[in-house]
Amino acid sequence: MFSQITRPVRTFIDQFSNINQGIAAGERIFSIIDAQSEIQDKPGAIELDGLKDKIEFRDIHFSYDGSREVIEGISFEIKRGETVALVGPSGGGKSTLSELIPRFYDVKAGDILIDGVSVRDYTQDSLRAHMSVVAQDTVLFNDTIEGNIAMGKAGATHDEIVEAARIANADCFIQEAPEGYQTNIGDRGVKLSGGQRQRLSIARAVLKNPEIPVSYTHLRAHETEAD
């Protein structure tokens, strides 16, 4: 009789603990979702309708802490169709410059202009819709290979995903995976190597086919045969 009571009670206690953990986790998640970004669209911000001429960095100054500048008076321009590489030592501000274009941060002085208009005059949604970012730290989800690549373009077909993977030199290792494109890669892509994760990130960017592609120093994690 006693054992018949203790078993369901123990089960109830275990489930109650799980519920409390779930509530605590939910509160943290919603606090992040509800957080307001410091960077907001200005009143009357306009839509970016594609890159027609050039991106101009005009006397850019930037500081993370408001005091020591990590970028001091940088000026250059990138014309439509050009590929520009920023080369320099670690900590030199290359990634920071890349993060200023989609307004992950705002410049402290100077300006970034797209077709003669400050990026701060465009809506963030329209600005980022014309961009892709292959970051140093690849963001992948506990989903299939195809599902992760497909996040680059809503409604992408399987053929489009395969072609993007081929261009990113990812198709070769995907074909060798246990279930091909339907292989689950685990949380944050834990089942893949660093180079494979970054090739999926590149494939996602290729699938989006943006007018303004931005790529950080992603080759550092590539295997030799993929370089």
Feature locations, PLM:
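Active-site-proximal flexible loops/turns
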Residues: Q21, G66, D227
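Cytosolic ends of transmembrane helices, especially the final helix of ABC transmembrane type-1 domains
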Residues: Q4-I32
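A short, hydrophobic C-terminal helix/tail in secreted or cell-surface proteins
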Residues: A221-D227
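Signal-transduction coiled-coil helices of two-component systems
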Residues: I19, Q36-I39
